Every structure is written in structure tokens, then in C-alpha cells.
Curated annotation (Swiss-Prot):
Belongs to the BABAM1 family. It comes from the Eukaryota. This is BRISC and BRCA1-A complex member 1. Keywords: Cell cycle, Cell division, Chromatin regulator, Cytoplasm, DNA damage, DNA repair, Mitosis, Nucleus, Ubl conjugation pathway. The VWFA-like region is similar to the VWFA domain. Its presence reveals similarities between the structure of the 19S proteasome and the BRCA1-A complexes. One of its GO terms (cellular component) is BRCA1-A complex. PANTHER family: BRISC AND BRCA1-A COMPLEX MEMBER 1. Residues 137-340 are annotated as: VWFA-like. Component of the BRCA1-A complex, a complex that specifically recognizes 'Lys-63'-linked ubiquitinated histones H2A and H2AX at DNA lesion sites. The BRCA1-A complex also possesses deubiquitinase activity that specifically removes 'Lys-63'-linked ubiquitin on histones H2A and H2AX. In the BRCA1-A complex, it is required for the complex integrity and its localization at DNA double-strand breaks (DSBs). Component of the BRISC complex, a multiprotein complex that specifically cleaves 'Lys-63'-linked ubiquitin in various substrates. GO terms for biological process: cell division; DNA repair-dependent chromatin remodeling; double-strand break repair; mitotic G2 DNA damage checkpoint signaling; positive regulation of DNA repair; response to ionizing radiation. The keyword DNA repair applies. Residues 35-45 have a biased composition (Low complexity).
Length: 370
């Protein structure tokens, strides 16, 4: 019996020797300390749910929350070796609900605020999308006697008539537009006292040009603009789109009138159908007006009234109008036709257009009012 007691005492001493290494030794606890600073690595890391799967966030959460917990646990294990595990577990479990309010109080990323509703624009006209959809171009050529006057100055210095120059520039316009987009279609209308549809819509420039040069001028007493629009209405059907501002149209219709008469203000009483056509966002009415404004007899300013009448037809502000003097160089007529090559849905307002690379304001104004 005496021999067994020392054995038991030795066993107890042996167990006491093992305890500091496994349970109550602070140094051993520090060795077993996890990267989060907690004493028991088997417990789930409390900061992880707060920061998600981001690895850097674990270190940030441990540096802010875990050290006070680990210091308390170490002090408890040093004073009460047997109850160290229970105290540590209690401290860690108690720290879990304590950290939840800290997680809730963390600043959240600012949520994007919903933009305030912008009131609709006060513009009176609607703009279609700026797309390069096919065009149906109706070229209306005036055949009044003013077109046959030998007044325009060609490049070589000789005098030529406006009809000859207009025929050449129309051919260049049609062929250039065809190279830009082969889906464009062209038609030809001649204007005497009445308007006559001469060539139907075609995408072949040669077909239109074959009808362009066999034309002669006539003495015209009047000009009925409404009759011209009625002829156009019989040959076209404008697209009907539900959402004008977002859905591109299958095509647009553009009328290009080359006109040279000085009969004062135009007599024009449009019907409801003509008004609807002029107000359509898919119809454009461009005008190249030839006049005698720079002749020696400058007292006659009736051409200005005619030009003002054409300007009043544009209720949308999207049409282009040019006035060219018959006493000037013929190249000005070509320049105006070149400016009309731009797609009507993609070009700017005429008052905003600039055709010069120079910064001189005077030059820009001259270029915009050719």
C-alpha cells in the first residue's frame, strides 16, 4: 500500500506536469493562438461573417475586436488553471453577440440615389434617332426661264446658265449619295406651271441621270407650291412609328427643291394632309434658291420675300435652305449641294453648322451664309 501511494503521487505530479503544457500554460496558449488572436482555434472565427470572404478583412476585424478578449482569457488562465478552458469558452461565446452590434454599426457603402425625374423638354418638335437609315430623295428642278440665263461664272471664267450647273451638281449629288449608301433611292420632279413626276424612285443613279439632261426651260406664269406637295403625297407614304425618339424609322423622305423665280411671296394654303406631312419628323424639305440679288438694280428685293416664305415652311427647324446669287461664281452652287449630302437625321441645325477649319468668326459666318 505504501508503494502504491507514491505511485499515485507521481501520477498526480505527472498530470500536473502535463497540464501546464496543454491547458493552463500561457506560453502554450500563445503557441496555440490562431491568426485571429483567440485562444481556442477550434471555435469559429467571429469576425469572418462580418467581412465576408475577403482575406484582408479578417485581419482588420481581429485587430479591432479580438485582443481584449485574448488578454482577459490569458489572465483568467493564469489565476484559475482548472477553469481556464471554461472561462475562455465563455468569454469567446460572449464576445460573439457583443460583436454583432459592432458589425451592424459599420458604415455601409453609399447606395446610388435614384435620379429625379426630369420634366419633358419644352421643344415643339420631336427628334428621331440619329441613324443612317435609307433616304428617299425627291429632287425637284425648276424649269422656269430664269434657269436659262447666262449669268453664272464657271471656273474658266466663261458664263453659263443655272440649268446646266444644276444638272451637273444633281448628278454629282446622286452618285455621291449612292456611294455612301446604296439603299438610297432617288426620284425626279420637274416644275413648270405645274409639277410633274418625271422619274420614279430608283437606287440606280444612271436611271435618274438619263432623264435629267433632256430638259428645256419654259416661260412660267405662276408657281403653285401646294400642287408640288400634292404630287409628292401621291407617291410617298411616310413611316408611322410608335416611339419616335427611340425607334429608328425604316426610311425618311427628303424633298430637294432647286428654285429660281422672283414672284414675291408664295401663295400657299396647305391642306391638312400637307400640314401633316410637313410636321412629320421623317419628312424634310430642303431648298436651294437662285436669285438676282447682287445685280446693279438692287432695288428689287422680292427674292427676299420668296426666301422668307420658304423659311416659314420649316416648323421643325430641321430643314436646310440656301440662297445663291446668279451673278456669282458657279462654285457656290456646288458648295451648297455638297452641304446637303449629310443625312437629315444626322446633320445639326443649320444655324449650328460650320464648314470652315479656321477660327476666325467672320470666316465662320461667311461660310454659314453662303
Amino acid at each position: 500500500m505504501e508503494t502504491t501511494e507514491p505511485g499515485q503521487a507521481d501520477g498526480e505530479e505527472r498530470m500536473m506536469d502535463l497540464r501546464p503544457r496543454t491547458r493552463s500554460n500561457p506560453e502554450g496558449a500563445e503557441d496555440r493562438r490562431s491568426s485571429t488572436g483567440s485562444l481556442n482555434s477550434s471555435l469559429p472565427s467571429a469576425p469572418q461573417p462580418a467581412v465576408g470572404s475577403r482575406v484582408e478583412g479578417e485581419g482588420e476585424a481581429a485587430s479591432s475586436d479580438s485582443p481584449p478578449v485574448s488578454a482577459t482569457a490569458i489572465a483568467a488562465t493564469a489565476s484559475v488553471p482548472v477553469a481556464a478552458v471554461g472561462n475562455t469558452t465563455t468569454t469567446n461565446t460572449a464576445s460573439l453577440p457583443a460583436m454583432s452590434p459592432a458589425v451592424k454599426e459599420r458604415p455601409k457603402p453609399s447606395q446610388p440615389t435614384m435620379p429625379t425625374q426630369i420634366p419633358p423638354s419644352a421643344e415643339l418638335h420631336l427628334r428621331a434617332p440619329r441613324v443612317n437609315c435609307p433616304e428617299k430623295v425627291i429632287i425637284c428642278l425648276d424649269l422656269s426661264e430664269e434657269m436659262s440665263l447666262q449669268k453664272l461664272e464657271s471656273i474658266n471664267g466663261s458664263k453659263t446658265n443655272a440649268l446646266n450647273i444644276s444638272q451637273k451638281m444633281i448628278e454629282m449629288f446622286v452618285r455621291t449619295k449612292h456611294k455612301i449608301d446604296k439603299r438610297h433611292e432617288f426620284a425626279l420632279v420637274v416644275v413648270n406651271d405645274d409639277a410633274m413626276w418625271l422619274s420614279g424612285f430608283t437606287s440606280d443613279p444612271r436611271e435618274l441621270c438619263s432623264c435629267l439632261y433632256d430638259l428645256e426651260t419654259n416661260v412660267c406664269e405662276s408657281f403653285n407650291l401646294e400642287d408640288l406637295f400634292n404630287v409628292i403625297l401621291q407617291k410617298i407614304e411616310l413611316p408611322q412609328m410608335e416611339n419616335i425618339q427611340t425607334i429608328p424609322p425604316p426610311f425618311v423622305v427628303r424633298t430637294l427643291l432647286v428654285f429660281s423665280r422672283h414672284a414675291g411671296m408664295l401663295q400657299f394654303n396647305p391642306s391638312d394632309a400637307v400640314k401633316k406631312m410637313l410636321q412629320s419628323p421623317y419628312f424634310f424639305f430642303d431648298v436651294v434658291f437662285l436669285h438676282n440679288g447682287t445685280e446693279e438694280q438692287t432695288e428689287d428685293t422680292s427674292w427676299k420675300d420668296v426666301y422668307a416664305s420658304f423659311c416659314e415652311l420649316d416648323t421643325k427647324g430641321m430643314c436646310y435652305r440656301f440662297e445663291v446669287s446668279l451673278c456669282g461664281p458657279a462654285i457656290e452652287l456646288h458648295n451648297c449641294m455638297a452641304k446637303l449630302l449629310c443625312h437629315p437625321l444626322q446633320r445639326p441645325f443649320q444655324s449650328h453648322a460650320s464648314y470652315s477649319l479656321l477660327e476666325d468668326e467672320d470666316t465662320l459666318e461667311n461660310e454659314a451664309t453662303v
